[in-house]
Amino acid sequence: ILRADSFKKPVFYNGSTFLFDKFAIFLKNNAHIIKINNQLHIYKDGIYTAGYGEIEAAMIKHIPDLNRAKRSEVVDYLDLLIRDNTKPEDAHLIAFKNGLYNIIDGSFVGFTPEHIITNKIPWDYTPGAYCELADKTLDNIACHDSQVRLLLEEAIGYCFYRWNELGKAFILTGDKSNGKSTYLSMVQNLLGEENICALDLKELGDRFKTAEMFGKLANIGDDIGDEFIANPAVFKKLVTGDRVSAERKGQNPFEFNNYSKFLFSANQIPRIKDKTGAVQRRLVIIPFDANFSKDKAGFDPTIKHKLKSPDTMEYLINLGLAGLKRILENRGFTDSDKVKKALDEYEEDNNPILGFFKECEDEDFHIEDNTTDLVYSRYQEYCLANNLQAMSKTAFSRQIARNLHLHTEVRRIGKKTARFYVAGDQK
């Protein structure tokens, strides 16, 4: 056994001079320090961990009295010494507390430094694990809807997968006391605090906030605000795993491909600027219709605490893995009538002109073959009645063309002319 005193001077000191370069090379080779996305990582407990803190902790194991200045010197040298990035392991290999599970072939192996993984679920993988309480809770949360239940399981499994292949974000909706926070609490406890962050939708794109998602399995935003999101560009990139730039205070900016999954809960989903529908295509809106109140039979105010047990977590792991296998096999999530309805309703809320179209349909008002002035005037009345900001007439006509495939055409009415919305090819 090497003691710090015995090798300190002959190996890492020349007289009183600290040989920071030799010590850095020693650490690199013996503590398995690499770069991922230009960020230094060190191998610890089966995975590679980012951050200078763990690297400095490894230093003082060898030289306990190494001061901060010398530790910083070593870190700076490591940053220069290690120039190339190491590619992380494929997403199909998932780390649990007791080993690595391969979602493709179902194999389970031990940890080695050769497997470059940066996240570990802090619970054991136990085939066949079951928890009756968790099973019943998920059924109750889903209101015994099998499609919703499968989606809840798939959302868990999708968090295990370090790749945003499907480009989807989950939003759980509904009033209070319906199980949203209980479900998210289970997911948070399952993934572990070190694997999650908690940004609101409106915070995405803030200068230093995006960096918080680097290396996380999930961003879990409970009870997000309903403020209008005017610039969702960063959100779209993060959901699809496109490369984004991030920055930590006092450090150089860096780029990364996000694999963190989004799970938000909201009483009311914020409106998002989405002219092309690109944001809406990324959303999976799951309605939570249950009612867990004090006057209901079986109400348990301690349910969140009870659902933190190892039995619950190991059962959720099995459900999540089964859900992930379904996702990969089907190349998508389980279809749900409730989810489709919720998404259609949000589309109407998010793009008020769709609500106007629906009102026209309900009241048998035909946009086609009506004058643009009359239709726009009716649209303004609709906005006024619903406390909405009306878009300009030009923008309104663009929306008519995009959604209803109508263009404008000048026609004569008696001695006057007027512009009408018409179908067919534009002349």
Task: Please tell me what each predicted stretch does.
Residues 1-29, 123-140, 355, 412-427:
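Replication-associated primase and helicase/ATPase modules
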Residues 2-123, 391:
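Intein modules and their embedded homing endonuclease domains
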Residues 17-20, 143, 188-193, 228-244, ...:
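A short, contiguous, amphipathic alpha-helix enriched in charged residues
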Residues 30-54, 100-217, 284-286, 320, ...:
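P-loop NTPase catalytic core of nucleic-acid-dependent motor ATPases
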Residues 68, 72, 82-83, 87-90, ...:
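Positively charged interface segments
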Residues 215-218, 258-262:
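Loop/turn-to-beta-strand initiation segments
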Residues 217-241, 254, 272-279:
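Conserved AAA+/SF3 P-loop NTPase catalytic/coupling segment centered on the Walker-B
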Residues 310-351:
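Phosphate-handling catalytic cores of nucleic-acid transaction enzymes
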